[in-house]
A protein has these predicted regions:
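Active-site C-terminal subdomain of aminotransferase-like
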Residues: 240-243, 250, 255-362, 372-375
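Active-site phosphate-binding strand-loop segment of PLP-dependent enzymes
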Residues: 195, 199-246
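PLP-dependent aminotransferase-class I/II
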Residues: 169, 176-217, 334
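PLP-dependent enzyme catalytic core of the Aspartate aminotransferase-like
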Residues: 2-11, 15-18, 103, 107, ...
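Conserved PLP-binding active-site segment of the aspartate aminotransferase-like
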Residues: 56-57, 92-95, 327, 364-374, ...
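Conserved PLP-binding catalytic core of the aspartate aminotransferase-like
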Residues: 69, 336-347, 351-387, 397, ...
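N-terminal "arm"/small-domain region of PLP-dependent enzymes with the aminotransferase-like
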Residues: 2-39, 45-116, 242
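Conserved N-terminal alpha-helix of the aminotransferase class I/II PLP-enzyme fold
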Residues: 107-154
């Protein structure tokens, strides 16, 4: 049986307006229900965020700028990505070690689907536990050097559910100001008192610990992003009797000689960190996330963490895919070396051309900071026209004035492709600036919104 995986184009004007559909046998009830629905829709369309979004779309349309988001690829993304019949140089996905679609993974997943099907069928706590879950958690714990591990079906939910469950109103959470949204959401959900500290600044973190720690029953601080000073963090954890959580979603398989992440990079005792978090969607080519750490904490999470207890278990086929990818990563450290080389090459070439790469250290993700959100979006569109696919990242994901093109590097990428992309940016910047200046002159009332 053939399966058609070709994307079907969706248009907003094809969405049915159901406000006038007769859902009741009573005409008066139907009329009243319609009025309520129309009032709710009207209220939504007047929200400030919705109006801002509408203005952005309108400005893009006036400038002839197509939406660079939600473009649908019809096959796996590698060094190139295939969209609407055309190949683009791909800097938009994080298959860092070029393991996705590896024949071993494909074969293992095929067999797992035959044996286990495609769903766990229930929460793991009450009937959804499958052999691949155990094998994956055991393998990750062994790789990380920890006592135990728990895997969640979502990387975002891993942080939100873990932090939200473990901490409460009597606790203190200190987090890097550039932490991922999931860390901030988890802190908010917990009800704990929370304070951000300056990005990667252990000095600012200690200032907060000195001032705040004594007032709270329990304290945790978390780090992610650029390579933090983990040995110093461990010192602070012990000095102030805190818990330490490290999110290394973008360091597993990237840092260290064998891809062991921050732990291998600094050669620290994994037991000195209470909660090691990472995702399974990047170097391990699946989806979900994990927490690795002390057995007591992990077991507590398995019996109470809402994102684990009240969610269906990870599909067994995904667990098998991640387990197989981990084995390949451990067996083929040359993939890690290739990723590290191409990342440094991209960073050094970009800087040699005078581009702003921020605090990037050349590990898998390199930003090209361009400033204004509209400028960045239009620059991404111009690059797309030239066959280069890279995502614009703008407010609120980053601060106003710090919009950027975010380049994901992978072991599949080439030096030639890196040069092509960077040279294209240099050529397009003055062109995009001219287009924006013209637009602002013609639309002075909307250009600054």
């Amino acid at each position: 049986m053939e399966t058609d995986f070709q994307p079907k184009r969706a248009h907003f004007n094809h969405v049915k307006d159901t406000s006038s559909m007769n859902m009741s046998s009573s005409p008066s009830e139907t009329h009243q229900g319609t009025e309520q629905k129309q009032e709710a829709v009207s209220t939504f369309t007047k929200l400030r965020a919705k109006l801002s979004f509408d203005r952005m779309v309108a400005m893009g349309a006036k400038m002839g700028m197509p939406n660079p988001l939600f473009l649908c690829a019809d096959r796996a993304a590698k060094a190139t990505i295939h969209i609407n019949g055309k190949d683009y140089i791909n800097f938009s996905t994080y298959d860092y070690l070029d393991i996705n679609t590896h024949p071993e993974i494909t074969a293992a997943v095929t067999e797992a689907a035959r044996v286990f099907g495609t769903s766990a069928g229930a929460s793991r706590l009450v009937g959804g536990e499958r052999t691949p879950h155990h094998l994956l958690e055991e393998a990750i714990a062994k790789f990380m050097g920890t006592e135990d591990c728990i895997v969640y079906v979502s990387g975002h939910a891993t942080n939100v559910s873990t932090i939200g469950f473990l901490f409460g109103p009597r606790d203190l959470i200190l987090y890097d100001q550039l932490s991922h949204n999931s860390l901030a959401q988890g802190a908010r959900l917990s009800g704990a008192t929370k304070f951000p500290f300056q990005h990667n600044s252990c000095d600012d973190l200690e200032r907060l610990l000195e001032a705040k720690r004594k007032d709270y029953k329990q304290c945790v601080f978390s780090m992610d992003g650029n390579i933090p000073d983990v040995p110093r963090l461990i010192e602070l954890k012990k000095k102030y009797n805190c818990m330490l959580m490290i999110d290394e979603a973008h360091s597993l398989g990237i840092l260290g000689e064998h891809g062991g992440g921050i732990r291998e990079y600094f050669n620290v005792d994994p037991g000195d960190v209470d909660l090691w978090m990472s995702t399974l969607s990047k170097t391990l080519c699946g989806c979900g996330g994990y927490i690795a750490g002390h057995r007591g904490i992990i077991q507590y999470l398995k019996y109470g963490s809402p994102g684990f207890v009240f969610s269906v278990g990870m599909p067994p086929v995904i667990a098998v895919a991640c387990l197989t990818a981990l084995k390949i990563m451990e067996r083929e450290p040359e993939r890690v070396k290739k990723l590290q080389h191409i990342s440094r090459y991209f960073l050094e070439y970009a800087r040699s051309k005078g581009l702003d790469t921020g605090e990037s250290q050349g590990y898998a993700i390199v930003p090209i900071i361009t400033g204004e959100s509209m400028f960045t979006g239009f620059l991404a569109t111009q690059l797309l026209k030239r066959g280069i696919y890279v995502m614009p990242i703008a407010f609120p994901a980053v601060k106003e004035g710090e919009a950027r093109l975010r380049f994901f590097l992978s072991a599949a990428q080439t030096e030639e492709n890196c040069r092509t992309a960077i040279d294209a940016i240099i050529e397009e910047i003055p062109h995009v600036r001219q287009i924006l200046e013209k637009y602002k002159a013609e639309h002075p009332q909307t250009a600054g919104e």
